[in-house]
């Protein structure tokens, strides 16, 4: 039961983490492009 709960949490967090990293990289790219 605990394993199922943990795997569900991990599977839910992975896409959110990837999305957050992509958004952070995108905003950083937009800022550097606007600054130059």
UniProtKB/Swiss-Prot annotation:
Q: Which GO terms describe its cellular component?
A: chloroplast thylakoid membrane; cytochrome b6f complex
Give yes or no: UniProt keyword ATP-binding: no
Q: List the disulfide bonds.
A: none
Q: Which UniProt keywords apply?
A: Chloroplast, Electron transport, Membrane, Photosynthesis, Plastid, Thylakoid, Transmembrane, Transmembrane helix, Transport
The UniProt entry, under InterPro entries, shows:
Cyt_6/f_cplx_su5 (IPR003683), Cyt_6/f_cplx_su5_sf (IPR036099)
One family name in Pfam for this protein: PetG
What terms describe the molecular function in GO for this protein?
Answer: electron transporter, transferring electrons within cytochrome b6/f complex of photosystem II activity
List the subcellular locations: Plastid, Chloroplast thylakoid membrane
An annotated GO BP: cytochrome complex assembly
Protein's membrane topology: Single-pass membrane protein
* Chain ranges passing through the membrane: 5-25
Q: What does this protein do?
A: Component of the cytochrome b6-f complex, which mediates electron transfer between photosystem II (PSII) and photosystem I (PSI), cyclic electron flow around PSI, and state transitions. PetG is required for either the stability or assembly of the cytochrome b6-f complex.
| Protein family membership | Belongs to the PetG family.
What is known about its subunit structure? The 4 large subunits of the cytochrome b6-f complex are cytochrome b6, subunit IV (17 kDa polypeptide, PetD), cytochrome f and the Rieske protein, while the 4 small subunits are PetG, PetL, PetM and PetN. The complex functions as a dimer.
List the protein's name. Cytochrome b6-f complex subunit 5
Q: Which organism is it from?
A: Cyanidioschyzon merolae (strain NIES-3377 / 10D)
